[in-house]
Structures are given as structure tokens and as C-alpha cells.
Amino acid sequence: MVTLLPIEGQEIHFFEILESECVLYTGWIERASGSSIYPEAKARLPLEALLGSNKEPMLPKETVLSLKRYNLGSSAMKRNVPGHVLQRPSYLTRIQVTLLCNSSAEAL
């Protein structure tokens, strides 16, 4: 079963978010996985804290991490995720790989 994420009153499949949204991982890691074995993820921010009135993710000024956005939906569904994304030695990559591994193979 694929994790469902509640967004604006409706539940959306995790792989649909990968396919259609370009979201900062820190915004939805807590809802997608519930917890993480990686210590860096403990500093995650809830999605509501990142969203402004225009629903655009807003990071606090004191955030030092260089956060990147990825849209892996089509690539993941074709089993053709770019190597530089999966091999990038950062906690965002580890979260990404963890989330993809936690999703059911049928959904991807």
C-alpha cells in the first residue's frame, strides 16, 4: 500500500506527488515516512511551517542547508532515475532513496 498524504483536505498517493509536484523534501518527509533512521531528518520542518499565504514553500532565513527540488515521478516510474540524483552524497538523496524504497513496487 502506498502512503497517502493529506493535502488541502484530500488524500493523494505518494507516487502522484512525485509525478505532479516539485516539493522540498523537508516539507513532506515527516508525512511520507513517519520517521527516519537518518539523524539529519530529525531537523525536518512540517509542511505548514514552510507554506506561506500563496502556498509556495518558504524556508526560514536561518536555514543553512542547500535544499534542492526534484521531480522524479516519470523517471521513477520508468525505472530510469538519473544516476547523479541517486548517488548525490547528501541527506536529501538518502531521504529520496528511502522514500522510493518504502513505496510499493507496484505503485512505481
UniProtKB/Swiss-Prot annotation:
Keyword Heme annotated: no
Placement of sequence motif BH3-like: 5-12
Principal localisation: cytoplasm
Localization of this protein: Cytoplasm; Mitochondrion
Tissue specificity of this protein: Ubiquitously expressed.
Keywords: Apoptosis, Cytoplasm, Mitochondrion
Cellular component, GO annotation: cytosol; mitochondrion
A GO BP annotation: apoptotic process
Superkingdom of origin organism: Eukaryota
Impact after mutating L5E: Fails to induce apoptosis
Functional description taken from the UniProt entry: Functions as a proapoptotic molecule through the caspase-dependent mitochondrial pathway of cell death.
Stated name of the protein: BH3-like motif-containing cell death inducer
Organism of this sequence: Homo sapiens (Human)
Organism taxonomic ancestry: Eukaryota, Metazoa, Chordata, Craniata, Vertebrata
